[in-house]
């Protein structure tokens, strides 16, 4: 009985380790698997031998120049906004942020935490954690259009539930709650600078 157990154990070890010319064979790292792609971007899943998943992403210009390429812990979500602009939402353990990529010129925007609306030119986001404000601004130009609306509250959180532009495209109507169980409120954020000839 002991001999049979020893033989069985030896065979099992051979299957587990594997051999190549008398040396243990290492298990290769798995290849990346594309989970999302387009003309100018690709998101791939990487899984190591321990089963831990990570994601890589690459964004390129129309002519193939790499704008940005990196690895992140959570799967990013890509949203093409038009033929020359991508928005990518990245997720942390407790938050999310969006970065925009101009795939024609190669520009990359700042990271907008808690972004909840965009139209290809402007982005609206909740800056409540830092300054209790809702902000709408130019995606790329720090000196471009910017409007801030202060929201006074004792609540620690502001949750945007809906954001829609008016039919004329000049105002963004934002519905939000202060805290998880707060009553829903509305605020209007202008999308056009009335003091100039446009955005």
Region locations from a protein language model:
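Sec-dependent signal peptide recognition
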Residues: 2-10
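C-terminal motif of bacterial Sec signal peptides marking the signal peptidase cleavage site
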Residues: 15-18
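Long, hydrophobic/aromatic N-terminal blocks
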Residues: 28-69
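Repeated scaffold domains used in trafficking and secretory/extracellular systems
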Residues: 28-35, 71-81, 110-125, 155-165
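Short beta-strand elements that form the blades of beta-propeller/WD-repeat-like
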Residues: 34-51, 82-93, 118-129, 134-135, ...
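Surface-exposed loop/turn elements that mediate protein-protein interactions on large endomembrane-trafficking
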Residues: 52-69, 92-111, 132-155, 179-199
């Amino acid at each position: 009985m002991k001999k049979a157990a020893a033989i069985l154990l030896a065979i099992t070890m051979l299957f587990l380790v594997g051999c190549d010319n008398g040396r243990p064979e290492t298990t290769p790292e798995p290849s990346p698997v594309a989970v999302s792609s387009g003309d100018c971007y690709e998101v791939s899943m990487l899984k190591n031998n321990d089963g831990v998943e990570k994601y890589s992403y690459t964004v390129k210009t129309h002519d193939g120049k790499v704008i940005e390429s990196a690895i992140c812990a959570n799967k990013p979500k890509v949203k093409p906004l038009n033929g020359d602009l991508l928005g990518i939402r990245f997720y942390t353990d407790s938050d999310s942020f969006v970065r925009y990529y101009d795939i024609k010129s190669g520009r990359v925007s700042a990271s907008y935490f808690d972004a909840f609306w965009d139209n290809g030119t402007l982005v609206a986001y909740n800056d409540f954690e830092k300054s209790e404000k809702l902000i709408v601004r130019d995606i790329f130009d720090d000196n471009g259009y910017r409007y801030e609306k202060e929201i006074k509250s004792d609540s620690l959180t502001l949750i945007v539930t809906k954001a829609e532009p008016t039919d004329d495209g000049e105002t963004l109507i934002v519905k939000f709650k202060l805290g998880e169980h707060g009553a829903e409120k509305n605020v209007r954020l202008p999308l056009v600078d009335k003091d100039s000839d446009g955005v």
